[in-house]
Amino acid sequence: MEAHLDWYGVPGLQEASDACPRESCSSALPEAREGANVHFPPHPVPREHFSCAAPELVAGAQGLNASLMDGGALPRLMPTSSGVAGACAARRRQASPELLRCSRRRRSGATEASSSSAAVARRNERERNRVKLVNLGFQALRQHVPHGGANKKLSKVETLRSAVEYIRALQRLLAEHDAVRAALAGGLLTPATPPSDECAQPSASPASASLSCASTSPSPDRLGCSEPTSPRSAYSSEESSCEGELSPMEQELLDFSSWLGGY
């Protein structure tokens, strides 16, 4: 206890501390609350912290610092500012490759993000163009299917269903038209009523044969030696009679099929 009161055996330190005013020297010591221990800083106390500037106090503080360091009561002094700066610079130089790798990784991540955003923008643009073309195709299809140009707008499913039904109706109509045409062609190719014996047998002279044919055929409507009608006229008359029985829609489809047959 006596050694502690004697300031670790440093002569003149107690007298110098008593001679220094308390108000001026209080700024050099850290603030301590009641019941707390006061610890000295781990580095020498600069001269500027002491406003009293007593030579004895300064010398006593230096001796106290040296004695405490030798006794191991306080930790070793920190390196000087130049040493600290050199160590920090060496640490920065050692960590510089990692910093470079991190910066490269950061730049590569930013580049990948920009490229991915550009790819997403191009994909969205292609999708918008595709949807636009699909809508234009359905709009053109609605104008060709029955009841497609009505005030009520058909949905895509209804438009496709109407188009399928319309195509099937056209196929049935074309099949019926082909059957009628085949039947008409078969009727025209069958042999007609054979001519009379008088016209079939050869006579002595052409003049007598013509007179006998003229006498036996009272009217030109009979099938004698009269000149037969052309197959085209008979086909056109029968086709006109068949066309008269068709509905307007069937007539339109028939005209469409005849137009397709021309190609």
Curated annotation (Swiss-Prot):
Organ and tissue specificity: Expressed in follicular T-helper (Tfh) cells.
Compartmental location: Nucleus
Changes seen on gene knockout: Embryonic lethality between 9.5 and 10.5 days post coitum (dpc). Abnormalities in extraembryonic trophoblast cell types; by 8.5 dpc, the ectoplacental cone (EPC) lacks diploid precursors and by 9.5-10.5 dpc, the spongiotrophoblast layer of the placenta is missing and the labyrinthine layer lacks normal highly vascularized organization. Unexpectedly, does not exacerbate trophoblast phenotype at 8.5 dpc when combined with simultaneous knockout of basic helix-loop-helix transcription factor HAND1.
Domain of life: Eukaryota
Principal localisation: nucleus
UniProt domain bHLH: residue ranges: 118-170
BP GO terms, sorted: cell differentiation; chorionic trophoblast cell development; in utero embryonic development; negative regulation of Schwann cell proliferation; negative regulation of T-helper 1 cell differentiation; negative regulation of T-helper 17 cell differentiation; negative regulation of T-helper 2 cell differentiation; negative regulation of transcription by RNA polymerase II
Known function: Transcription factor. Binds to E-box motifs 5'-CANNTG-3' in the regulatory elements of target genes, probably as a heterodimer with another basic helix-loop-helix (bHLH) protein such as the transcription factor TCF3. May bind both open and closed chromatin, acting as a pioneer transcription factor to allow other factors to bind and activate lineage-specific genes. Required during post-implantation development for the generation of some differentiated trophoblast cell types.
The protein's name in its UniProt record: Achaete-scute homolog 2
